[in-house]
Design a protein with these regions (language model features):
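Proline/serine/threonine-rich low-complexity linkers at boundaries of modular beta-sandwich domains
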Residues: 27-38, 501-510
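Terminal connector regions
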Residues: 107-134, 497, 577-615, 620-632
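Catalytic grooves of carbohydrate-active enzymes
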Residues: 58, 183-189, 263-276, 288-314, ...
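Active-site beta->alpha N-cap acidic-glycine motif
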Residues: 127, 131-226, 233
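Contiguous beta-strand segments within globular domains
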Residues: 36-62, 66-68, 521-529
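Secretory targeting and sorting signals
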Residues: 2-29, 616-628
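Intrinsically disordered, low-complexity Pro/Gly/Ser/Thr-rich segments with frequent PxxP/GP/PP motifs
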Residues: 78-110, 554-582
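Membrane-proximal extracellular "stem/stalk" segments
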Residues: 471-472, 480, 485-607
């Protein structure tokens, strides 16, 4: 498949944006059979209440005709004509003719609102042709409504994907859209875009020389870096864009995902210092709801606002329905009752920005909100670009419509989150997931998680196998496997990554064995030797746990450094008065059991004889004492 150079794509996108603003209010439409070929209303999309109506009706005829008449009406929302004008021309050839109409809006005595222009064209020998277009009349005193546009690059991880032309094309589209997005943010700072890119994509592009499209990945990263340097905010995100509702109770996983996401951001933007992408306090939870417990973990890690879905927000009683809320988080997660601003994405408005054909309807809806008595604090629009979204060029065209209207004030996410007087809300702890993963998916993840975390604890986070297994595990938790339609059509790839992570962990930890034979102590106390054989070829740090109901274990847990080969450790125990007992010995790493054995501990025969003799001597002495005293009394 032939691909255009990046410069050509960028030029085409810029040209499309430039042309969008000059389109007429109603495109030409073919008329019925007759002399009139087409009729077009030429009008602005909006004008001020104190402005001038400068309108036109363009008529194209098929052949010469004796007479063509055009009338134009301005209809209010009830369909009542508030202004009517009529013009007629005779002896027209096969030409394009434009009827011009002009009138001061103030003379019409109309109020601000949404009106409909209706043109009717008649000609000799043909039926009337009718066309309509929308016209918004705005009062200059109307306060613009803040609109924050967050553009996210959306695609599934490439890890574990079978190489194919389709996969290569998807990767190319994603990287190209990301590059175009960076250029759009730099060339049009007035759009005040906020960007969100899953960190795993940044990591893939950072190692673009290993991918099938190295140049386009590098271009995407370079373009985003320039946008960040220009001051475009970039939201933080967890490494694999995980399903937060599914791992909400696994705090260690959440912290690991956030830490790895931050590391990927820092690696992708090494020279940005305190740029928004690196030091951002905003978080993108755009693949599903944000549970309250997850928000508390994020708040403890420096997040002050989050962009997420509306399904997890529960407005306080009496609070206005809005798209920006102040949420107080629980204090039992280290956040001390911190307040986080939640920017809830408007699904309907977001859909209007995905297609340039719907942008005018979105602008009209925003006008209605701006003119209403209950104005929103902010409207949050989230749109996806990339393989799982729309093209950046389409978003650019739609944005041009919003950027040109006076009732919309585009703001970035940090500015929207900084608004005062936000309504109060809470976050649901267990928001409903309309598209859950297939049965058994998260059980497989949980099994792999125990093994991988054990490997990381034993071998260290810098170990090659540990890092590979952890990456696979975190990617397996990605919500991207659900796909843009939520069908989880890619679930098999996520499960394959989880199983691969577990196998990597087993390949290392499975080489640790435990040999703990039965032992006879020389006395009632002693040390039980335990042999741990480490055949992994690397140094591991594990916990040696000992427990028993019949033997008193003097040290139940010992941290042990296992060097390659045999390692002998001792467990101090005491039998007390018992002659024998059983003790369980476990080798664990971060709670994951690597090996286990049961040891029988007995005291030596000589020790038991000495103990028995001592008891008999004591008993004999007591008996002699009793007999002497009783004899004297007798």
């Amino acid at each position: 498949m032939a691909r255009l150079p990046r410069s050509v794509l960028a030029a085409a996108a810029a040209l499309a944006v430039a042309l969008c603003a000059s389109l007429p209010a109603a495109a030409a439409a073919p008329a019925s059979a007759g002399p009139v070929r087409s009729v077009t209303i030429v009008a602005p999309r909006w004008l001020y209440l104190d402005g001038e109506l400068d309108l036109g009706v363009r008529v194209v005829t098929r052949n010469s005709t004796r007479r063509v008449a055009a009338s134009l009406d301005l209809l209010d929302e009830a369909g009542v004509s508030r202004w009517h004008s009529y013009q007629s021309r005779t002896v027209l050839g096969s030409v394009t003719y434009e009827y011009s109409f002009s009138r001061s809006v103030a003379d019409l005595g109309i109020a601000p609102g949404v009106y409909r222009l209706r043109a009717r064209v008649t000609s000799a020998g043909s039926p009337t042709v009718e066309r309509s277009a929308q016209l918004i009349v705005v009062d200059r005193s109307t306060h613009p409504i803040p609109v924050s546009v967050v553009v996210r690059v959306s695609a599934a991880p490439s890890a574990g994907e079978t190489p194919s032309d389709a996969a290569q094309d998807a990767a190319f589209v994603t990287a190209s859209d990301a590059a175009d997005l960076g250029r759009l943010a730099v060339l049009h700072p007035g759009l005040h875009l906020t960007l969100a890119v899953p960190p795993f994509l940044l990591q893939e592009w950072s190692g673009a020389e290993q991918t099938s499209t190295p140049s386009v990945g590098t271009d995407a990263l370079d373009s985003l870096q320039r946008a960040v340097e220009a001051g475009t905010p970039m939201l933080r995100g967890m490494y694999a864009d995980p399903d937060l509702a599914a791992i909400a109770t696994v705090t260690a996983d959440l912290e690991m995902q956030d830490a790895r996401g931050g590391a990927a951001l820092s690696a992708a933007f090494p020279s940005q210092g305190t740029a928004p992408s690196v030091a951002s306090t905003g978080f993108a939870a755009l693949s599903g709801p944000l549970p309250r417990s997850v928000a508390a973990v994020l708040a403890a890690r420096g997040v002050r606002y989050a962009v997420t879905d509306t399904s997890c927000v529960v407005p306080a009683r009496g609070a206005a329905v809005a798209e920006a809320y102040a949420v107080t988080l629980p204090s039992d997660r280290g956040s001390s009752g911190a307040t986080m601003t939640i920017l809830a994405a408007d699904r309907a408005a977001s859909g209007g920005l995905e297609d340039p054909a719907h942008a005018a309807a979105l602008a009209t809806e925003l006008f209605s909100r701006a003119a209403s008595a209950q104005r929103a604090h902010v409207v949050v629009i989230v749109v996806d670009v990339g393989a799982d979204g729309v093209r950046t060029s389409a978003v650019a065209q739609a944005l041009e419509v919003l950027a040109g209207v006076p009732w919309v004030r585009l703001v970035n996410a940090p500015a929207a989150a900084g608004a005062s007087g936000l309504p109060v809300a809470t976050l649901s702890e267990s928001p409903a997931d309309p598209t859950p993963a297939p049965d058994g998916y998260w059980e497989t993840i949980a099994d792999a998680r125990g093994r991988v975390f054990g490997l990381v604890a034993a071998a260290g986070a810098d170990d090659t196998d540990a890092r590979s297994a952890l990456d696979s595990l975190l990617l397996a938790e990605s919500r991207e496997w659900a796909g843009p339609d939520g069908s989880w059509s890619r679930a098999a790839r996520g499960l394959a990554l989880a199983r691969a992570a577990a196998q990597t962990a087993d390949s290392v930890l499975g080489k640790v064995t435990l040999d703990a034979p039965s032992v006879t102590l020389p006395g009632s106390e002693g040390k039980v030797p335990v042999s741990i054989i480490n055949s992994s070829g690397r140094t591991l740090v594990v916990d040696l746990d000992a427990s028993s109901s019949g033997v008193r274990v003097q040290r139940s847990r010992t941290s042990v450094t296992l060097r390659p080969g045999e390692n002998v450790e001792s467990v101090p125990v005491s039998l007390g008065t018992a002659t024998s007992g059983r003790m369980r010995v476990d080798v664990k790493a971060d709670g994951y059991q690597i090996a286990t054995a049961t040891v029988t501990v007995t005291a030596s025969y000589q020790d038991r004889v000495v103990l028995l003799a001592a008891v008999l001597v004591i008993l004999a002495g007591l008996l002699l004492y009793v007999r002497r005293h009783l004899g004297r009394r007798t």
